[in-house]
């Protein structure tokens, strides 16, 4: 019987298999940041162990870093301590680190791919749930806990139970206004935030194959929001073109050999998935969330749902609590929801294509009065590219704030936060209560919807703008 993509990569990395025990997998790339690594290094220090594979380990600073005045001391003592601890640990153990101010610094899941460290057929781990991002390359990538971080640092392996596999097939053409962010939000709304629990998701079909690499990263990034262990997309010419020439990509004969292997990383025709979901791309539309989890979303053209319409009691209760927290009324048009802040950035939508798409909507327009808009590139490299293309000027001339690279408003762990009751349209990945700051209210959107929302001051798509200019950009 044939094997799925996930099964092929998994099998290639098993270094020990015993009946009744989890498989022991070799890990090809271990990414670190300041939040989940301190206790792991402490464990190594107490046991007198070194980092086993320094060549497969890399760290960056992202979660707690400020996006303004980065040359000044960090005010928050906890954030400052975590960054100082990471720097000391990396120096003590010899781990490569890209700190705040370094040209390669940025959000960990942006840095790995742009350096060519993330490659098809590899295993990638990080103490961060959105490690699934790297699955866009056909890598098996997943977030791990701090004790597992220590285990990988010490052994370069990880004992894991083999997940099931789910195929999510998206066929057809995405409508002009529909982006990868809209697609993944629609998928999560369809299968639910627990629909992928225990599975590795494989996104496939003609609509997926037509996506750029950065759009594919957006899709895989949010796999965890459906409860999945990981998300993957089979590598193809788009993948190879993205990787070729990057800092850590193979070269010469090694490149040819790598591509030959990468081309085998597809699910066999006779592979059997444990579950399958099929989606018609033509039926999709710009999508936004209205509630307090990524599965509580709807097309922008819809109204806030009535909790009474849910047959399941737990879903009905969750909807009631979400509307109460979000300050919304059942039946209210989503387009009538005003926002205070718009955030473009994060490991979901902080790459150069995302900034290009937002800039294409903002070009020649102004952010609405009373709306604060933050544009935060996912890495210093992304920022430099945006400046080279003049995107920063488009943003600032529109009235948006152009910031330094970092996780920023994706999570309330740095100075970029919502105030209680403040409402945002955000290109990030989570809309939990307090995710962007205590009492903050978050609507997840695409970069294009974020930009249009900033201009009009309420949830909107580029089609809602008063002129007929068609925004350029890459889906």
Swiss-Prot record:
Cofactor: binding comment: Binds 1 [4Fe-4S] cluster per subunit.
Keywords carried by this UniProt record: 4Fe-4S, Amino-acid biosynthesis, Branched-chain amino acid biosynthesis, Iron, Iron-sulfur, Leucine biosynthesis, Lyase, Metal-binding
CDD domains in the cross-refs: IPMI (cd01583)
Gene3D superfamilies xref list: Aconitase, domain 3
Pfam families the record matches: Aconitase
Essential cofactor(s): [4Fe-4S] cluster
Chain residue ranges for the region called Disordered: 418-442
Sequence positions that bind [4Fe-4S] cluster: 347, 407, 410
Alphabetized GO MF terms: 3-isopropylmalate dehydratase activity; 4 iron, 4 sulfur cluster binding; metal ion binding
E.C. code: 4.2.1.33
Catalytic reaction list: (2R,3S)-3-isopropylmalate = (2S)-2-isopropylmalate
UniProt GO BP: L-leucine biosynthetic process
Signal peptide span: none
Pathway given in the UniProt record: Amino-acid biosynthesis; L-leucine biosynthesis; L-leucine from 3-methyl-2-oxobutanoate: step 2/4
Function summary: Catalyzes the isomerization between 2-isopropylmalate and 3-isopropylmalate, via the formation of 2-isopropylmaleate.
Family statement drawn from the similarity comment of this UniProt entry: Belongs to the aconitase/IPM isomerase family. LeuC type 1 subfamily.
Cited HAMAP family: LeuC_type1 (MF_01026)
Oligomeric form and interacting partners: Heterodimer of LeuC and LeuD.
The protein's name: 3-isopropylmalate dehydratase large subunit
Gene of this entry: leuC
């Amino acid at each position: 019987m044939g094997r799925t993509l996930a099964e092929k990569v998994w099998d290639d990395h098993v270094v020990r298999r015993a009946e009744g025990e989890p498989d022991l997998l070799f890990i090809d790339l271990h990414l670190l940041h300041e939040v989940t690594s301190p206790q792991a290094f402490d464990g190594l220090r107490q046991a007198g162990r070194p980092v086993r594979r320094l060549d497969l380990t890399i760290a960056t600073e992202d979660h707690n870093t400020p996006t303004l005045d980065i040359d000044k001391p960090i005010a928050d003592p906890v954030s400052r301590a975590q960054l100082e601890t990471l720097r000391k640990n990396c120096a003590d153990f010899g781990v490569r680190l890209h700190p705040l101010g370094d040209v390669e610094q940025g959000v960990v899941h942006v840095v790995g791919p742009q350096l060519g460290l993330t490659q098809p057929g590899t295993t990638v781990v990080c103490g961060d749930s959105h490690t699934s991002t790297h699955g866009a390359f056909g890598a098996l990538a997943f977030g791990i806990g701090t004790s597992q971080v220590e285990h990988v640092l010490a052994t370069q392996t990880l004992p894991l139970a083999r997940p099931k596999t789910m195929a999510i097939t998206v066929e057809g053409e995405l409508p002009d206004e529909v982006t990868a962010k809209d697609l993944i939000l629609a998928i999560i709304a369809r299968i639910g935030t627990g629909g992928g629990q225990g599975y590795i998701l494989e996104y496939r079909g003609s609509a997926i194959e037509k996506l750029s690499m950065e759009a594919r990263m957006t899709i895989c990034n949010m796999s965890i929001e459906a409860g999945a262990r990981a998300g993957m997309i089979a590598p193809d010419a788009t993948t190879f073109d993205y990787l070729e020439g990057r800092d850590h990509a193979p070269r010469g004969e090694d490149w040819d050999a790598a591509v030959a292997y990468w081309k085998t990383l597809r699910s066999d025709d006779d592979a059997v998935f444990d579950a399958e979901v099929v989606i018609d791309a033509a039926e999709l539309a710009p999508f936004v969330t209205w509630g307090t989890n990524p599965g509580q979303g709807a097309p922008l053209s819809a109204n806030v749902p009535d909790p009474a319409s849910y047959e399941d009691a737990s879903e009905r209760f969750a909807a009631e609590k979400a509307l109460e927290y979000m300050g919304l009324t059942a039946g209210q048009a989503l387009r009538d929801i005003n926002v205070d802040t718009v955030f473009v950035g994060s490991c979901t939508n902080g790459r150069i294509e995302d900034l290009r798409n937002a800039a294409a909507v903002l070009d020649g327009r102004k952010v609405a009065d009373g709306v604060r808009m933050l544009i935060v590139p996912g890495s210093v490299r992304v920022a430099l590219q945006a400046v080279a293309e003049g995107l920063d000027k488009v943003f600032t001339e529109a009235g948006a704030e152009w910031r330094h690279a970092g996780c920023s408003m994706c999570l309330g762990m740095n100075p970029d936060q919502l105030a209680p009751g403040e409402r945002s349209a955000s290109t990030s990945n989570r809309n939990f209560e307090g995710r962007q700051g205590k009492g903050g209210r978050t609507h997840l959107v695409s970069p294009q919807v974020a930009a249009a929302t900033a201009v009009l001051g309420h949830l909107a798509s580029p089609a809602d703008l008063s002129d007929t200019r068609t925004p350029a950009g890459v889906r």
